[in-house]
């Protein structure tokens, strides 16, 4: 029978777990690598209580962030449509493209809320018209918004 040691990870370890996870590993792996590298500590009752307290705080923080994302989604959907002005050439083709940064700036101007540009998904916009953008506000909260590209 193989003996295992219970440890609490203090840092993220690839293929093993994240910081705060309780893991069972071989004694040699714990003694020779994880503990000397300060990647883990022995799982004592006091440390387990600390880990559980940290997990609960993180859970509460995630719930608050999700609630803020839902409120932000409602505010974005109330706006309806955003207008972005671009210079136009022949055949209603715009110079350059509309980027996620342009959309983020338009959102901030319309709602005074900051949105991370990396969470904005837009189609390739090369002409005037109305397009749909998807904004990821949280892992499971996304908002749809219309973008109207007009000539400046």
From Swiss-Prot:
GO terms for molecular function: rRNA binding; structural constituent of ribosome. GO terms for cellular component: ribonucleoprotein complex; ribosome. Belongs to the bacterial ribosomal protein bL9 family. This is Large ribosomal subunit protein bL9. InterPro entries: Ribosomal_bL9, Ribosomal_bL9/RNase_H1_N, Ribosomal_bL9_bac/chp, Ribosomal_bL9_C, Ribosomal_bL9_C_sf, Ribosomal_bL9_N, Ribosomal_bL9_N_sf. It comes from Trichormus variabilis (strain ATCC 29413 / PCC 7937). SUPFAM superfamilies: L9 N-domain-like, Ribosomal protein L9 C-domain. It comes from the Bacteria. PANTHER family: 50S RIBOSOMAL PROTEIN L9 (PTHR21368). Binds to the 23S rRNA. NCBIfam families: L9. Gene3D superfamilies: Ribosomal protein L9, C-terminal domain, Ribosomal protein L9, N-terminal domain. GO terms for biological process: translation. It holds the Pfam family Ribosomal_L9_C. Keywords: Ribonucleoprotein, Ribosomal protein, RNA-binding, rRNA-binding.
